[in-house]
A protein has these predicted regions:
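A helix-centric hydrophobic-segment signal that preferentially recognizes long
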Residues: 2-165
């Protein structure tokens, strides 16, 4: 009789363990998929920022090169050189301002659109992580999670110190 009861309990716990493991794997896959979806706009944002910085340098350099050539060509006469140096100073300021006004605005507006995509992906990712973390922290599923080496994952935008809670 006791053997039958023990066998029945082991079967129930075994079934629970298998179903819990499947649920944990499903939640883990959902989390990985959400992270993969979020990685696309995050990478695009980095690329846009790199382009913005490269474009800024290119704009500055082209205007500065022309003004520098004028300085080199007018080294002999002080008045001409000072005039060329002034053009160089203005070229640097104008190039920097042009970047801020045109290229940077366009790139920043594209980055703002990416930020919206990132915010949506962040919500999906954080929801998946919260579901997985809730299961990992619950009893008795937490026991199975510990044995199967599932761990609590950080939310996007959360510091590592906040995971202790």
């Amino acid at each position: 009789m006791w053997a039958l009861a023990l066998l029945l309990m082991m079967t129930l716990f075994g079934g629970y363990g298998v179903s819990t493991h499947k649920k944990l794997k499903e939640l883990q896959k959902r989390t990985e998929k959400a992270y993969g979806m979020m990685a696309v706009p995050l990478d695009a944002r980095l690329e846009r920022i790199d382009r913005m910085l490269a474009g800024e340098e290119q704009t500055l350099l082209s205007g500065i090169r022309e003004a520098r050539r004028a300085v080199e060509a007018n080294r002999e006469k002080r008045e001409d050189r000072l005039c060329a140096e002034t053009r160089l100073t203005l070229a640097i300021a104008a190039a920097a301002q042009a970047v801020v006004d045109e290229e940077e605005r366009a790139i920043l507006s594209r980055i703002a659109l990416l930020e919206q995509d990132i915010a949506l992906c962040k919500e999906d990712y954080n929801a998946a992580v919260q579901a997985l973390n809730g299961k990992v922290r619950s009893f008795p599923a937490g026991l199975i999670a510990a044995v199967r080496k599932f761990s609590v994952l950080p939310l996007f935008g959360e510091s590592k110190g906040a995971l202790a809670h």
